[in-house]
């Protein structure tokens, strides 16, 4: 299976609101349907024609063999999730990612924004509802994973804070707050620290615990 490609641009063209590039990789020419944003980045020299790197999804059918190319792995993986929804094909997936950035699409799905999603050509009300139903829990879980990774990375670089947060976690659990409540709280505290709404000298176990309980009691 082809996961990504690195090569040199041979040509690019547009047909019926679809965007294509031909990439030379070690003497072989790969025809790839790509996103409008990638197409225009290449043609405006924001992406070097000499070294194009794309994440790929290879779709093989009885009557066709197609490659779809994306600038990031997250885009490619989201495209694959869209394809796993019954009744939705590759062109609907490309249309969604052409209409919205990945973050915009995730936000629309998370917020049940049927109006925005249904503005994509070829997507009606029922398909919009199916997309939200199938993907909402997945995109929310993905965002939670990303947020947790950011928290872990931040605390890894700030060992003193890491120790304080572990103590806060244990203290709040002893006060019968649930693990879920505590987990949802930590990003708020860390954002306050990052945004400097907390003065450096006030970052202590006592002050952070007080702020944590204030959040939990007024949520």
Curated annotation (Swiss-Prot):
Region (Domain I): 1-71
InterPro entries cross-referenced by the UniProt entry: DNA_helicase_Holl-junc_RuvA_I (IPR013849), NA-bd_OB-fold (IPR012340), RuvA (IPR000085), RuvA_2-like (IPR010994)
Region (Flexible linker): 151-161
Subcellular location: Cytoplasm
Keywords, alphabetical: Cytoplasm, DNA damage, DNA recombination, DNA repair, DNA-binding
Signal peptide: none
Stretches for region Domain III: 161-219
Annotated GO MF terms: ATP binding; four-way junction DNA binding; four-way junction helicase activity
One Pfam family named in its UniProt record: HHH_5
Region of interest (Domain II), residue spans: 72-150
GO terms under biological process: DNA recombination; DNA repair
CC per GO annotation: cytoplasm; Holliday junction resolvase complex
Transmembrane segments: none
Main location group: cytoplasm
Superkingdom: Bacteria
Swiss-Prot/TrEMBL domain comment: Has three domains with a flexible linker between the domains II and III and assumes an 'L' shape. Domain III is highly mobile and contacts RuvB.
Record function comment: The RuvA-RuvB-RuvC complex processes Holliday junction (HJ) DNA during genetic recombination and DNA repair, while the RuvA-RuvB complex plays an important role in the rescue of blocked DNA replication forks via replication fork reversal (RFR). RuvA specifically binds to HJ cruciform DNA, conferring on it an open structure. The RuvB hexamer acts as an ATP-dependent pump, pulling dsDNA into and through the RuvAB complex. HJ branch migration allows RuvC to scan DNA until it finds its consensus sequence, where it cleaves and resolves the cruciform DNA.
Family the UniProt entry places it in: Belongs to the RuvA family.
Self-association state and partner proteins as the record states: Homotetramer. Forms an RuvA(8)-RuvB(12)-Holliday junction (HJ) complex. HJ DNA is sandwiched between 2 RuvA tetramers; dsDNA enters through RuvA and exits via RuvB. An RuvB hexamer assembles on each DNA strand where it exits the tetramer. Each RuvB hexamer is contacted by two RuvA subunits (via domain III) on 2 adjacent RuvB subunits; this complex drives branch migration. In the full resolvosome a probable DNA-RuvA(4)-RuvB(12)-RuvC(2) complex forms which resolves the HJ.
Protein name in the entry: Holliday junction branch migration complex subunit RuvA
Originating species: Prochlorococcus marinus subsp. pastoris (strain CCMP1986 / NIES-2087 / MED4)
Biological classification of the source: Bacteria, Bacillati, Cyanobacteriota, Cyanophyceae, Synechococcales
